[in-house]
UniProtKB/Swiss-Prot annotation:
SUBUNIT field: F-type ATPases have 2 components, F(1) - the catalytic core - and F(0) - the membrane proton channel. F(1) has five subunits: alpha(3), beta(3), gamma(1), delta(1), epsilon(1). F(0) has three main subunits: a(1), b(2) and c(10-14). The alpha and beta chains form an alternating ring which encloses part of the gamma chain. F(1) is attached to F(0) by a central stalk formed by the gamma and epsilon chains, while a peripheral stalk is formed by the delta and b chains.
Signal peptide annotation: none
Annotated transmembrane regions: none
InterPro entries (alphabetical): ATP_synth_OSCP/delta_N_sf, ATPase_OSCP/dsu
Protein name: ATP synthase subunit delta
Organism name: Streptococcus pyogenes serotype M1
Protein topology in the membrane: Peripheral membrane protein
Any single Gene Ontology cellular-component annotation: proton-transporting ATP synthase complex
Keywords attached to this entry: ATP synthesis, Cell membrane, CF(1), Hydrogen ion transport, Ion transport, Membrane, Transport
Family: Belongs to the ATPase delta chain family.
Source domain of life: Bacteria
Subcellular localization: Cell membrane
Amino acid sequence: MTKKEQALIEQYAKSLVEVASEHHSLDALQADVLAILETFVTTNLDQSLSSQAVPHAEKIKLLTLLKGNNSVYMNNFLNLILQNEREAYLYQMLQAVLNEIAIVSNQYDVTVTSSLPLTEEQKSRVRAVVAKKFAVTAGRLIEKVDPSLIGGFIISVNNKVIDTSIRRQLQAFKMNLK
């Protein structure tokens, strides 16, 4: 992706988030974006929208189906995307919208990787650690299980990481022995 395309994507995302923020509709916008992104993942819609082989009329039909129960701001955004024929960038724009919402609301997704699934008590402790160490509000808690960690956990928030895994400790110990 070129810098020009990236700037375009970011500008669309910022504009949508600004409008939703002015009207105190960030939560509704975030729900809409997450639902549409889920549709992209389950249907490979991104390939259809970015394909030159799919006629513009078909792309219009596909995006019209996405307009269902969305907020007015999301539907207007989708109309704007269609008018300007930017459907190929929609998936990246929606990802950028989530990033902008996180920045504006200081609420970031938290990814926790552990060797075993977390209990509810552990999840609440993770949220407390995130609030204290990173000075952000925890958004969605995305849990991943990786038995190769052996024990401990890895918390990732806004490109910052806390790694207390036994795997990392063993790697550090191995490096110290060299």
